[in-house]
Design a protein with these regions (language model features):
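Non-catalytic accessory regions of SAM-dependent methyltransferases
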Residues: 1-141
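Non-catalytic substrate-recognition/targeting regions of SAM-dependent transferases
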Residues: 125-138, 161-228
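Conserved SAM-binding loop of SAM-dependent methyltransferases across substrates and taxa
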Residues: 255-268
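Conserved SAM-binding motif I beta-strand of class I
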Residues: 269-274
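S-adenosyl-L-methionine
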Residues: 278-321
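Mobile active-site "lid"/loop adjacent to the S-adenosyl-L-methionine
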Residues: 318-347
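C-terminal catalytic and target-recognition region of SAM-dependent MTase-like enzymes
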Residues: 357-419
C-alpha cells in the first residue's frame, strides 16, 4: 500500500520527538499522496477540503525536513488530525494488523499482571499511555467470579481497529461479557456517534467487586465514565492506614469508597458527603453491602457549604478526604479552579484537629503538580496551619504515565499532617 505522508510545519516536530502522540491540524503543512499512478504534493488544507486522504486511513508523519516521526490514523473532523499509533512505518502495521493489535493488548495486560492478581479489578488499557490512542479498557472481577470488561472507543484511531481490539481482548482476557461505554461527548468531536451496550453475550449491568476487602457495587451501564474510578484504588488502601479509631470526613464521596476503606481499617466514625443525591444513594448501597450503617453516615450537601457550616459549628475531624471532580477541563479555567481547590483545602485545614490528616486530590491534567502544591501551600498560609506532606501519589499502577504525553499524568494525591 502507498500511505500518504504528512509533513509538519517547521519546528512542530519537537513535541512528537519527545513522545507526544498527536499532530494537530494547524501543525501540518503539506501532504504527499499517491493519486492513481503517481505521487503528488498538496497543501494540507487542500487535502482536507477535497478529501484526497480519507478519514480512518493510516498515514505517516514527517518533520518539515523529512525526518520520519511515526504512523497514525487521520481524522479530518478532529482538531487532532493524526493520532500516532506506531513508531514504525505504516506498512509494518498492515502486514499483520491483527498481530499488531494483539501484541499491544498483550503488552498492556502483562504489565498489569505484575501488580494485580486474577481476582483484582484494574484498567487494562489507558489509551495513549499504552500506545493505543482513544482506547480505554477496564477489567472487573465480580463477586460471582466472572470477568467483565468495559471498553471505550473514544477516537477514530481506536474505532478503525475495533474488530482487532475486541478479538484480542477475547483471546487474552477471556471475559464473561463485554460492555461498551463509548458514550462520552469527545466522540462527537471525532465525528463519531455515541454507542453503548453489550457486545455479544449479555451479563449483569450491576455487579459487586471486592476492593481492598471492601465490597463495591459497580454499575457498568450507568456509572460515571467506565463504571468506577479504579485509579484511586491504591490511594484508598494507603489512606486507610491513618484512619483506625479516627473520625473521618469523606467529601465528594461518589461511591463512598474512600470512607468505606476507612471503615474497614477501623475508623470510629465516617461521614460521606456529596452534592449529588444519586451519588449519595450509591454510597448508601455500598454502606449496606459492607454492614457499615452504624459507623458510616451520608450527607447530601454542597461540600463548599458543608465545610463552612462545620467550621461555623466548631465541628472537628481527625481525617478529611478531598477528592473533588476536575474543577477545570481547559487551560483557560485554571485560575478559577485554583480558587476552588484553595477554598476547600483551607476550610478542611481549619476543621482538622491538631495533628489531623488531610488527604487532598486533583484529577485535572491542566492543574499540574506545581499548581497543586502551590495551592496547598497558600491554603496552609491562609488557614494559619502548618502542613507536613507525608506522601505524594498519582494514579494506581494500571494508569502508567507516558513521558512526553503529560495528559497521562493527571492525578495528584497528597497525604498531609496538619498542625
Amino acid at each position: 500500500m502507498d500511505f500518504a505522508r504528512f509533513f509538519l510545519k517547521k519546528g512542530e516536530e519537537r513535541e512528537i520527538r519527545q513522545g507526544f502522540l498527536w499532530a494537530f491540524d494547524n501543525e501540518i503543512e503539506r501532504v504527499k499522496f499517491f493519486d492513481e499512478k503517481e505521487w503528488k504534493d498538496a497543501p494540507f488544507a487542500e487535502i482536507v477540503s477535497e478529501g484526497k486522504v480519507k478519514d480512518g486511513e493510516c498515514v505517516e508523519i514527517f518533520s518539515s525536513a523529512g525526518g520520519f516521526l511515526g504512523s497514525g490514523i487521520f481524522n479530518s473532523k478532529s482538531k487532532i488530525a493524526v493520532r500516532i499509533v506506531s513508531d514504525s512505518h505504516a506498512n509494518k502495521i498492515f502486514e499483520d494488523k491483527a498481530g499488531f493489535i494483539f501484541k499491544k493488548i498483550c503488552d498492556a495486560y502483562n504489565l498489569r499482571r505484575i501488580h494485580f492478581s486474577d481476582e483484582d479489578s484494574f484498567r487494562v488499557c489507558f489509551d495513549e499511555a499504552d500506545l493505543l490512542p482513544g482506547l480505554t479498557v477496564e477489567r472487573y472481577f465480580s463477586e460471582d467470579k466472572k470477568i467483565y470488561l468495559v471498553v471505550q472507543f473514544l477516537a477514530l484511531a481506536a474505532e478503525v481497529f475495533r474488530n482487532e481490539i475486541l478479538s484480542a481482548l477475547e483471546k487474552v482476557l477471556k471475559p464473561f461479557a463485554i460492555y461498551e461505554r463509548s458514550d462520552a461527548d469527545v466522540r462527537e468531536k471525532e465525528g463519531l456517534e455515541k454507542k453503548s451496550g453489550w457486545l455479544g453475550r449479555r451479563g449483569k449491568e450491576e455487579i459487586v467487586i471486592l476492593e481492598n476487602g471492601v465490597r463495591i457495587s459497580v454499575d457498568l451501564a450507568r456509572g460515571q465514565k467506565t463504571g468506577y474510578f479504579l485509579d484511586q484504588k491504591l490511594n484508598r488502601a494507603e489512606i486507610a492506614r491513618y484512619c483506625h479509631g479516627k473520625n473521618v470526613l469523606d467529601t465528594f464521596c461518589h461511591t463512598g469508597a474512600f470512607g468505606l476503606n476507612a471503615f474497614k481499617a477501623g475508623a470510629k466514625s465516617v461521614i460521606c458527603a456529596d452534592i449529588s443525591s444519586e451519588a449519595v444513594e450509591i454510597a448508601k448501597k455500598n454502606i449496606e453491602l459492607n454492614g457499615a450503617e452504624k459507623i458510616v453516615k451520608t450527607v447530601c450537601a454542597d461540600v463548599f457549604e458543608l465545610l463552612r457550616q462545620y467550621e461555623s459549628d466548631g465541628k472537628k475531624f481527625d481525617v478529611i478526604i478531598l477528592d473533588p471532580p476536575a474543577f477545570t477541563k481547559s487551560a483557560r479555567a485554571v485560575k478559577k479552579a485554583y480558587g476552588g481547590y484553595k477554598e476547600i483545602n483551607l476550610r478542611a485545614m481549619r476543621i482538622l484537629n491538631p495533628g489531623g490528616i488531610l488527604v487532598t486530590c486533583s484529577c485535572s491534567y491542566f492543574f499540574d503538580p506545581n499548581a497543586f502544591y502551590s495551592m496547598l501551600a497558600n491554603a496552609a498560609t491562609d488557614s494559619h496551619r502548618r502542613v507536613q506532606v507525608l506522601q505524594k501519589h498519582g494514579a494506581s499502577f494500571d494508569h502508567p504515565v507516558l513521558l512526553g504525553y503529560p495528559r497521562s499524568e493527571y492525578l495528584c494525591c497528597a497525604i498531609c499532617k496538619v498542625f
